[in-house]
Amino acid sequence: GCCSHPPCNVNNPHICG
């Protein structure tokens, strides 16, 4: 998912913590 793959996880701290 997003939280396992940069830059998505870096760009979505409100989702990924």
UniProtKB/Swiss-Prot annotation:
Tissue distribution: Expressed by the venom duct.
Q: Which residues carry this modification: Glycine amide?
A: G17
Q: Which cysteines are joined by disulfide bonds?
A: C2-C8, C3-C16
Which residues in this protein are found as 4-hydroxyproline? P7
| Record key words, sorted | Acetylcholine receptor inhibiting toxin, Amidation, Disulfide bond, Hydroxylation, Ion channel impairing toxin, Neurotoxin, Postsynaptic neurotoxin, Secreted, Toxin
- Segments carrying the region annotation (Ser-Xaa-Pro motif, crucial for potent interaction with nAChR) are 4-6
Q: Does the keyword Secreted apply?
A: yes
Name the Gene Ontology molecular function terms of this record: acetylcholine receptor inhibitor activity; ion channel regulator activity; toxin activity
Q: Where in the cell is it found?
A: Secreted
For this chain, the family text in UniProt reads: Belongs to the conotoxin A superfamily.
Domain topic, free-text comment: The cysteine framework is I (CC-C-C). Alpha4/7 pattern.
Protein name stated in the entry:
Alpha-conotoxin In1761
Task: Give the organism the record lists.
Answer: Conus inscriptus
